[in-house]
Amino acid sequence: MELHSLSKRNSPVDPCNALEWSSGETSGDHIEEATIRDAFCYQKNLVSTPRADVVEVCRLSTSPASPTSLLQDSAIQTSFSLSGPPDSGNNQVMADRKVCNCCSQELETSFTYVDENVNLEQRSQRSPSAKGSNHPVDLGWGNPNEWSHETAMSLMSEDDDDTSSEATSSGKSVDYGFISAILFLVTGILLVIISYIVPREVTVDPNTVAAREMERLEKESAMLGAHLDRCVIAGLCLLTLGGVVLSCLLMMSMWKGELYRRNRFASSKESAKLYGSFNFRMKTSTNEDTLELSLVEEDALAVQS
């Protein structure tokens, strides 16, 4: 045994052709060496084949591994480690075998990963169908209660916007009209005051002034009096115009206030019918003939009745 192992280590004999040297060994050693040599010869013959063939062989050999195949793999690895520095063919065989093992592992993992994806896709395909079968009415309208609430809120906001726009527009018109009326009144008053303050007659002594100079002064005073009369007339017109504008604005404001009060009263009646609130009730007193407005709750009236 020792001589045979020494000669085997020292001589580079092809193990594929040296099957007769191991005839005198024990049965277990003979079986192990036979399997090692068979595998090595098979891999050496595959060196000349392309890499794609090796990959195909590896794929075909990815069946459930038996204990004998595992024993052969371990024996091949030990034989390569003991045989000294391997050549380029042996290196290529080892690399191909490692690639085959990696490919088999990747194929196994990718197979399970594909199964998971298929299951997930099947679940995702079943979920919308189940949702569609359970909720056929849901077409994107949402909850009808929420929709009605949103519509009511939108209508209320539109009404508020309309009332606010009307109030702002009426307020602007009323403000401009009131300012113009005040300006007319103030201007008319000032013109009337100026026309009465400015003196119209000549205050010069006629004995100290020549006759022609006196005539000229009288003409100027007459022209000044005419201008002052015009100022008085303009002032009175402006006062009248300011009073008319102010009275019109006052009437318009009263009319709008009455309309607003009626609208609010009507809305309060509607809200009282819907939700219950305070209502105005006219009642006559037994002692006096006057009418009194009293606020009575609708709920209290219902309880009393």
From Swiss-Prot:
Keyword terms: Autophagy, Cytoplasmic vesicle, Lysosome, Membrane, Phosphoprotein, Transmembrane, Transmembrane helix
Biological source species: Mus musculus
Family that this chain belongs to: Belongs to the TMEM74 family.
Gene Ontology biological-process annotations: general adaptation syndrome, behavioral process; macroautophagy
Statement: the UniProt record of this protein carries the keyword Phosphoprotein: yes
Reported function: Plays an essential role in autophagy. TMEM74-induced autophagy may involve PI3K signal transduction.
Transmembrane parts of this sequence: 178-198, 232-252
Chain positions found as Phosphoserine: 11
Alphabetical list of Pfam families matching this protein: Neurensin
InterPro entries: TMEM74-like (IPR029695)
Main location class: membrane
Protein name per its UniProtKB record: Transmembrane protein 74
Membrane topology, record value: Multi-pass membrane protein
Localization: Lysosome membrane; Cytoplasmic vesicle, Autophagosome membrane
Residue ranges, compositional bias (Polar residues): 122-132
Gene Ontology molecular functions: transmembrane transporter binding
One Gene Ontology cellular component: lysosomal membrane
Chain segments carrying region Disordered: 122-143
